[in-house]
Amino acid sequence: KIMNIRDIKRKKITEMTTDEILAERKFYEDVIANCKYEKPQDIADLFEAYTMLIWKHKQVGRVYDFYFDGLKEERDGGDNLEGSDHVVLDTLRALARTPDLNVVFEEIHCIGNPKDGFRFGQVVWNDATTVDGVGPDGPGSGLGYEDREDLEMCECWIRKIDGKWRVAKEASIRSNAAYKRVLG
């Protein structure tokens, strides 16, 4: 049976069958493997694929495939990150607290070209609970986000660095009240 990837995309990984998980993962892996880096839509699709593999499918090591080691990520509230190692650490911390996290893309728009690089903006919301999570203060609270309560917006600059396309800079803002309510 051929699956429609759009039907399973919004499901949390904990709600998916093994066949659905493997089909979705293969879909995103194919997007990455076949990216031509020629048009803005190529980059938008690529970033969505990386995001879903890193966050939903817990392939955190893929950060090293796409993020520049000298990355600077500017966040609202001043909790900035520098370097891909810090992005990995921050991602692992978040996933430990919300193991059922699912990122839902509302919109992603990209501009640019292969000569000058690309720039995109995206809006996502997170669907997650802390029921099975563990944080610095122990077991999770069991709280979860309401639909579209934890909105995140980010803008990324993609450049060719040492012959490879990488996220060179990222700026992000999120719904801090929801984040603090659920994660403390």
Set out the residue ranges of the language-model regions:
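A solvent-exposed, acidic/Ser-Thr-rich amphipathic alpha-helical stretch
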Residues: 45, 60-123
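Short, low-complexity N-terminal intrinsically disordered segments enriched in polar/charged residues
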Residues: 2-61, 65-69
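A compositionally biased, intrinsically disordered/low-complexity signal enriched
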Residues: 3, 54-56, 60, 64, ...
